[in-house]
Amino acid sequence: MSAVEKNDQKVFTDDNDMELNPMKEVIEDAVVDTNLQVPGPIPFAAWLIIVTELCERFSFYGASMLFQRYMLTHLLQSKGNATAISRGFSFFSYITTIFGAIVADKWLGKYKTILIFAILYTAGLVLLTVSSIDSLKDSLGLPGFLVSLYCMISWGTGGIKSNVSTFAAEQIPAEDYPHPSKPGVTINHAITVERVFRYFYMAINIGGMLGQAITPAVSEKAWDLAFMIPAIVFVIGIIIFALGRPKYYDRPPKGNVLGQTMRCLVYAFKNRNNRIPGTHWIQGANSANDGSLEWDNKFVNDLERTFHACKVFMVYPVYWALYNNMNDNFVNMAINMTRPAWLKPEQLSFVNSAVIVIFIPILDIIVFPLLRKAGFRLGPINRIIIGFSIVTFCFIYVTVLQHFLYKSPPYYNFTGFNPQGERISIPALITDVINDLSIWTQLPAYILIGISEIFASATGLEFAFRSAAPELKSVVMSLFLATNAFGSLIGMILAIWSNDPNFVYVYAAQAVAMFIMTILFAWKFAHLDNII
């Protein structure tokens, strides 16, 4: 019996049950601890979607990883302005996931939604390419850049993001079934979905890794050529995606589920005093028994379970605020460090993707199966806690690293004065302002963030998919992805201070915030992995 079916039959009798049981069902789906339960093969249809996402991520990272240096050197923006624009782009890329979920659920279904937003995305990449031509710099440079980012690429990627990972996971058979060649062994749906999300996340990073390796090198020749490559790769991805249409299972649209959800929550809150005593306030939506409401008891019960699960997402905006430093502030730091002539400041993020690509198969094929055989359960909540802890340690390291960069000659903290208060001359070109500290000292930061992603980000995607009933999956996935938008808002606020000599304090504040959030998250949710 699935968690959704169990949820339909569950009767809550006290406040304690109402707090624990909905989440208990989510964790039951997320953790399987038996030697007789194994993951099944990933269907070919799911692989086509995963390959499409690889191409999309090549395009996204291949273009976006250039933005900071492009704005600083070509569009001549300050570090603070460039960071604010970058975080604004990230905000729109993730807040638009909600719109993408509505379009898929109400009108088009996931396949058509992904395809249409992919075309808009490609048009944005074309405009970005044209606006970066040197001869158009003064007229179209900044306006074309902003329009392509905020009106086209961000909407395109947002519409895709809210649907593509869920679409891949929905290609998995919905029920457990016996292994065809191993008697007594069961192909488990939950573990198979977990595998899909890990390989989906690995594809994201293979695409990102290739984009980060290729486009920065090409940008040395011409910006427009560097931006053209992501556009071409994404066209290839769209073709691959379209060719798989006959093989896809595409859940038909069932109306505006997000709108129905909001109306149900509002009605439940207004009628919370009419619910059965001892039940959650959402059960107020069941107060009318005359069939006049647009939802039934099952929808309300599913919504309650989803509501409890979504509490887990509350800390993610802080995590994403730290994570997004890779796209801007880490590049700001790298620009001012010594590095080989062949290495561009943003290319070190290649290491982040490489770590994920290497570690995910190791965890999937070796580590997690051994843990299951040993009877050790590493549930989703504990995996997320591990990810949060690692990124906290990463930013402690980055804070110390920035401190040493400011202590290094010849330009120290880039304010025009040395530690003795004597005036020093700062070159006009930001790329000429380099202190005696190697860019390779950034390697631990990229490695740590990569490992944290496997535990926090990939698990978050998986948890979001499992925490919702079928009709709410796109809504919940979009809400999880929207946490990145709120992380970008935090980054936009921090961008006010994201100029030299303030970066030590900016990094330290983020490390402290993430440490506090990790402690609170563990205190509030760690028990959920142990309640079954």
Language model: regions and residue ranges:
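Membrane-interface alpha-helices at helix entry/exit sites of multi-pass transporters
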Residues: 180-183
